[in-house]
Amino acid sequence: MGRVGYWTLLVLPALLVWRGPAPSAAAEKGPPALNIAVMLGHSHDVTERELRTLWGPEQAAGLPLDVNVVALLMNRTDPKSLITHVCDLMSGARIHGLVFGDDTDQEAVAQMLDFISSHTFVPILGIHGGASMIMNDKDPTSTFFQFGASIQQQATVMLKIMQDYDWHVFSLVTTIFPGYREFISFVKTTVDNSFVGWDMQNVITLDTSFEDAKTQVQLKKIHSSVILLYCSKDEAVLILSEARSLGLTGYDFFWIVPSLVSGNTELIPKEFPSGLISVSYDDWDYSLEARVRDGIGILTTAASSMLEKFSYIPEAKASCYGQMERPEVPMHTLHPFMVNVTWDGKDLSFTEEGYQVHPRLVVIVLNKDREWEKVGKWENHTLSLRHAVWPRYKSFSDCEPDDNHLSIVTLEEAPFVIVEDIDPLTETCVRNTVPCRKFVKINNSTNEGMNVKKCCKGFCIDILKKLSRTVKFTYDLYLVTNGKHGKKVNNVWNGMIGEVVYQRAVMAVGSLTINEERSEVVDFSVPFVETGISVMVSRSNGTVSPSAFLEPFSASVWVMMFVMLLIVSAIAVFVFEYFSPVGYNRNLAKGKAPHGPSFTIGKAIWLLWGLVFNNSVPVQNPKGTTSKIMVSVWAFFAVIFLASYTANLAAFMIQEEFVDQVTGLSDKKFQRPHDYSPPFRFGTVPNGSTERNIRNNYPYMHQYMTKFNQKGVEDALVSLKTGKLDAFIYDAAVLNYKAGRDEGCKLVTIGSGYIFATTGYGIALQKGSPWKRQIDLALLQFVGDGEMEELETLWLTGICHNEKNEVMSSQLDIDNMAGVFYMLAAAMALSLITFIWEHLFYWKLRFCFTGVCSDRPGLLFSISRGIYSCIHGVHIEEKKKSPDFNLTGSQSNMLKLLRSAKNISNMSNMNSSRMDSPKRAADFIQRGSLIMDMVSDKGNLMYSDNRSFQGKESIFGDNMNELQTFVANRQKDNLNNYVFQGQHPLTLNESNPNTVEVAVSTESKVNSRPRQLWKKSVDSIRQDSLSQNPVSQRDEATAENRTHSLKSPRYLPEEMAHSDISETSNRATCHREPDNSKNPKTKDNFKRSVASKYPKDCSEVERTYLKTKSSSPRDKIYTIDGEKEPGFHLDPPQFVENVTLPENVDFPDPYQDPSENLRKGDSTLPMNRNPLQNEEGLSNNDQYKLYSKHFTLKDKGSPHSETSERYRQNSTHCRSCLSNLPTYSGHFTMRSPFKCDACLRMGNLYDIDEDQMLQETGNPATGEQVYQQDWAQNNALQLQKNKLRISRQHSYDNIVDKPRELDLSRPSRSISLKDRERLLEGNFYGSLFSVPSSKLSGKKSSLFPQGLEDSKRSKSLLPDHTSDNPFLHSHRDDQRLVIGRCPSDPYKHSLPSQAVNDSYLRSSLRSTASYCSRDSRGHNDVYISEHVMPYAANKNNMYSTPRVLNSCSNRRVYKKMPSIESDV
């Protein structure tokens, strides 16, 4: 009963399940049933009920099968009992699969299960014990699968362990256990095909059936410290026992075995040494219950896949009892569906050999407690090990530890320790690196992680390798876990110091700073690197300031430069030039001509400005020696100034990189960071010597910086570059290296690596370590041999340190030049504002400034006069209103008619002979049309062409009250003393506003009132001469009564209420008459009656004027030209009174080409001869008359003895005017110390006219001689030279005319036709018209006694020839009509053509602003060439008339007064 009843109870549940569904038809239509048996050994702490509950509805959900689990526990697991139990189960129930696990380590169990599966075709899964052991040569028809790893897979893990710990040298020991050949073959193949430098020294195969002596002989061949062993567990006990006897299981030997040797981890033979390494299936993390559940899931998933594909599952084998026959292999089995299985998210696939594709293997080691300890895991083809350095175990008590193998800890910190990944191809470390292990956390919450193999190199690693070779030790290197140097926290040391203190490492090598606190717990070697504390900051790209172009000099330098320019230098140059005897003198002292070219303060500033900045601008250079020296020194200063500016400009135009400047740990930015906006941010890496130093010395600083501390150096560098940190405080050696190797060299250390709290790096050893002395000696040896210096050059020198002195250039963009453009934009805006103000002032405000709004002198004029008054101490009286002048309309009309009648009477003086002249005839025709114009107030007959003035109707209007008001407001003016507006005779000193005349006369001028400002200068000139003036005061009173009552002594002659703004700045001064009431009378050499002296047609006003002129003869006139208009030479004035026009003169065609006469050889006049060629034949007085500066050598009123007495010395020529004195007739080669009489009398010590200095005298030789001498040699040459010569610009906008005057010594500006011919007779130019035509064409006689060579004149940009000027009309017409000269003369400039013929050479009272007449009939101005104009006026010479206002003005003429108003 016992045996049968037992099996009955065992098989009954299966039978019930198998037979239950048969009677029910409905059940047949349900899901097919899948019966799975679970058989386990009785030693497992699990019951059958628990096994059945492992598969519940949750696991079966979604499956198309009805899974039934049959659990069976076995008490005995011997092979016979095992086979009996399986066969009885199969006979009692129809099962589709079996999950089997035992508690043995016998590989025979797996062989029996494989046999049963091959005969019954029932899938069997061996999940534990012997059922999962490695077996060789499975049956091909078997469906036996194991939860385990194949021999190849385990061998791979064994080699991976050796590779991670760099155990490249090993030996292989096996027995003849099944599978050993495959094991040896796989290892050899892997080693031969790997890039790892494996060294398999020995392959030993032992036969344990022989005696132990033979085994010992074979084991003695082993010389490696790493041994791979492949055998069964029983054979391993024998082999390891023999190895112990041979000393192969000591401190330095590593035995690595597969799971076949370790077997059941609960059974550990005593022969196994400590430190034995085994590769085993994971029994720690993969429990038996999980394996059972996975086994049932594999069978269920495979059956479902087969059912889905074939719609059925294979029938189970009924029993294993019966005849031993080879059954037929079923057409479809579960085998192919069990190969690729994924269940519950896990890949549970199997290989063709029946092993798992992804087995869960672990690395276990037999620790010193004789227990198996899990130290690593193989998962997804990745090995992770717990120990960074494989622990060395003392296998047995009789084994001595190896003291030469050291465990060394280090810390990653470039350049001292640099950590890199292993080579992906070889999976090893390359040449100059050593293997080191780094702990990597897998789970931050549980601090779970693994040690990964890395490669270390660097400065400290090279020192470690040298120490290893010198001191003779081996080592295992690993990186510190927490990445710290070492700090005591809660009385516990961390970091590298903690590893040494707690003896997990023998020594610590790296950037470990030596300090007092650490020295108390560890021993330090001698320092091998000097270091300390330094500060690193980041360069930030600065922006170029708009004022960068001003930054080469400081503000004080710019201010000093402008002060020196505007205040000191410019004023100094102006003052030196002002008071210089040869300069552009503006002084109005005695003898100084006031109207030379002015050198003002503005011109001085402009000159110095141009010199400073090397601008090619037109400037006026000074002439004084002192001022020239000053300008030369300024030019030298300008060279230095500009060179310095240019040299420094590039440094300021580039974008400057801004660097925070700190001086040390005690800097204000560190101690008081909140004083800056934003606050200064700085930090360090905690738990280091730097933090300790700051904490002990600067508590407040340490408290502030804790929130900015960084995890490591690399994080700090990123924070610096991104602007999260302003400064980083750390070890100087590390920071210097990082600064030298930084990409872009953006990081710098303060003070070029300045170090605070200097210390050094050392090697930390355990307290009392025997290695300290040997390491110290080795380090000192490295320093002495220079090896340490080589290492520093290799590792501690960065590229940025080598290139820090290199200059990098880059293009300048708009940011660099923005300041210059801003300055230009500001200048344009300022110019626009000035332009608007200028127009506003000109059109709206200038009348008030000139006195139009208030009946007072203009503001600018008053300021100028006031400044002059302050400088020269001249008192200026206030003006008084002129008396009222009433004029009725009938009186005005009568005066107009009388004036017209006067002009008509002037025409009666024309004789018939002169009417034949084309000029006279055309003039008569022209005058005829002007009679009614005079009545209409359009002009007068005397000056018919000058109609550019404004008509009377525009001045007075229809209302005569306007005339009364206008006339009442008029001031005293010699030029406007007449009722009719127009041109009137002018005195010589009134004729040219651009020419200042200083006359030495024997008579006082009656009709002229000099300005009060001239009292000192003019009166001082005339003191001697006025004493001899015989003109009585009665004449003056009479003349004063004859003049109109407009005149008032309280008004200056040129001052007007309606003055032109253009004239007020540079008026010519007029002379003030002497204050003495009684003037001495002058001896009159010729007395004539009044009737014969004055023309009958003269008006009362003009007669008064002529009397005044006749009473004041001036024998010597000295003129100094003012600022000239762009120039043309004035031809000599011709007066028909002194020249008899020949009646038979053939006037050529006015439109004839001038070049034709030139080709015909017409006579020409040489104007460019040397004036000193033929003067020996003349007398002294005649020679002296040749100079245009003077009339004669003596005055009319002075005795001859005074003149002779003055020149008794051996004199040559005048030092001022260069004229020859009577006692010398030769050429002068040096400057004479003597002066002529005229220069002495005038006090004109220095002539500032630059043209006068170039003048040379000429000998008035006969015309034929001069012509013959000069024409042949100068004809072609002078023609070419004159084309290239450019004359100095002079103002010739005023044309002279012969004034009407009976006094030949002072001719009037208006005369009759009869007097015109008489006056021309005997004149210096009178002989010009009497020359026969044969003389002109034949002999080359000179018509002019003197000439001025053009080559010695100052140059101008305007052409010499008027024909070259496109703005002037042709001069051929009037040239022929006036003087009859050939228009093709290449050496002279003729008169410009006029649309309307002019009867005489007349002057124009219009300014240069109005050359054209109002009716647009052409040019009205007559220009006379300058080269024949005498420079010293004699009684036959005329002067140009003054410029007047334009046609729109009130036609008042003002004389210019020197003032500084034009300067500003």
Curated annotation (Swiss-Prot):
Alphabetically, which GO biological process terms does the record hold?
calcium ion transmembrane import into cytosol; excitatory postsynaptic potential; glutamate receptor signaling pathway; long-term synaptic potentiation; regulation of synaptic plasticity; synaptic transmission, glutamatergic
Where in the chain are disulfide-linked cysteines found? C87-C320, C429-C455, C436-C456, C745-C800
Q: In the record, where are the intramembrane regions found?
A: 601-615
Chain residues that bind Zn(2+): H44, H128, E266, D282
Q: Where is this site: Functional determinant of NMDA receptors?
A: N614
Q: Give the principal location in a single coarse category.
A: other
Ranges of the Extracellular topological domain: 23-556, 647-814
Provide a Gene Ontology MF annotation, just one: NMDA glutamate receptor activity
Instruction: Recite the UniProt keywords alphabetically.
Output: Calcium, Cell membrane, Cell projection, Cytoplasmic vesicle, Disulfide bond, Glycoprotein, Ion channel, Ion transport, Ligand-gated ion channel, Magnesium, Membrane, Metal-binding, Phosphoprotein, Postsynaptic cell membrane, Receptor, Signal, Synapse, Transmembrane, Transmembrane helix, Transport, Zinc
Q: Where do we find the motif PDZ-binding here?
A: 1462-1464
In terms of SUPFAM superfamilies, this protein maps to: Periplasmic binding protein-like I, Periplasmic binding protein-like II
Feature: compositional bias, Polar residues: 1001-1010, 1023-1032, 1165-1180
Its annotated compartments are: Cell projection, Dendritic spine; Cell membrane; Synapse; Postsynaptic cell membrane
Q: Name one GO cellular component term.
A: postsynaptic density
Phosphoserine modified-residue sites: S882, S890, S929, S1025, S1059, S1062, S1198, S1291
Mind telling me what this protein is named?
Glutamate receptor ionotropic, NMDA 2A
> What is the native source organism of this protein?
Pan troglodytes
